[in-house]
Amino acid sequence: MLVWLAEHLVKYYSGFNVFSYLTFRAIVSLLTALFISLWMGPRMIARLQKLSFGQVVRNDGPESHFSKRGTPTMGGIMILTAIVISVLLWAYPSNPYVWCVLVVLIGYGIIGFVDDYHKVVRKDTKGLIARWKYFWMSVIALGVAFALYLVGKDTPATQLVVPFFKDVMPQLGLFYILLSYFVIVGTGNAVNLTDGLDGLAIMPTVFVAAGFALVAWATGNMNFANYLHIPYLRYAGELVIVCTAIVGAGLGFLWFNTYPAQVFMGDVGSLALGGALGIIAVLLRQEFLLVIMGGVFVVETLSVILQVGSFKLRGQRIFRMAPIHHHYELKGWPEPRVIVRFWIISLMLVLIGLATLKVR
């Protein structure tokens, strides 16, 4: 919005030309989202407390979590608000990639909101019925994936980028839709599963979004895309603005979500952020890179799958409790230790993922 306005005002004052620079807009996008989150935080927490929108804690969970019962949840609303406002202010409104991310972000946010509403208002610990949750998540993911396939069919936008192999970029055909579906829905659920400790999900999300900001910048620059042997996608550059907005909003939320948390993001935040990371990976053709950089989310999800599978097949559990962060809690690790160590692992994985762009 401001970019469009600046383009009309630059003829009156050349200083408005700074709005055309991607690096400038990326920085102010981050700062805008950060300040909105910090401003909304105390007000959102007070409002949620007044409405008695408190966290529902499982009785079979770690005893250390019982003290979290009643802590305001659905704080993801402030994350989404900060991201959407910042993106609308600083990104080019004509960019289709930006709108793809916003559709998934807002759509998954609405699904998460309904899920949280069932938990905190109707006191239903299971939340929204699973089949309906996955149905609407699938509708959004398949709708966006199908639209992208129709527009980008047989172009670099539907190629698969394989790490370590610079000349291996097969056209996916209709498999593009299926892959995109699993990436978007899978990442949404993976971040949701990871969101079980104070700050555990938001910081890896910030790290991955920051990594994708660099990838988006390179993908949208023909010279760097050719240098790194990745597809050049002319709309990808504006995803830098989206990614930095996620970073800013996430850091602002972390101010209130760090241990001991004053507010939790709830499904409205975790599903939306996960879906956003998934669609960003799809748009940048970096699904494999998401698996590497988002390794913490992958491990958390696999721990649940393995735990359920083992119990059904063998009647035995692999972990003391899943997702795996609860396993370490039950082993006696203090919650802050689990959180910070997972943060460190996440940062290392993002750096490793970025390194794979050059190792080809």
Swiss-Prot record:
It catalyses: UDP-N-acetyl-alpha-D-muramoyl-L-alanyl-gamma-D-glutamyl-meso-2,6-diaminopimeloyl-D-alanyl-D-alanine + di-trans,octa-cis-undecaprenyl phosphate = di-trans,octa-cis-undecaprenyl diphospho-N-acetyl-alpha-D-muramoyl-L-alanyl-D-glutamyl-meso-2,6-diaminopimeloyl-D-alanyl-D-alanine + UMP. Pathway: Cell wall biogenesis; peptidoglycan biosynthesis. Residues 47-71, 115-131, 189-198, 257-262, 309-337 are cytoplasmic. Its main location: membrane. It is a multi-pass membrane protein. The keyword Cell membrane applies. Its EC number is 2.7.8.13. InterPro entries: Glycosyl_transferase_4, PNAcMuramoyl-5peptid_Trfase, PNAcMuramoyl-5peptid_Trfase_CS. It is found in: Cell inner membrane. CDD domains: GT_MraY. The keyword Cell division applies. Belongs to the glycosyltransferase 4 family. MraY subfamily. This is Phospho-N-acetylmuramoyl-pentapeptide-transferase. It comes from Salmonella paratyphi A (strain AKU_12601). The gene is mraY.
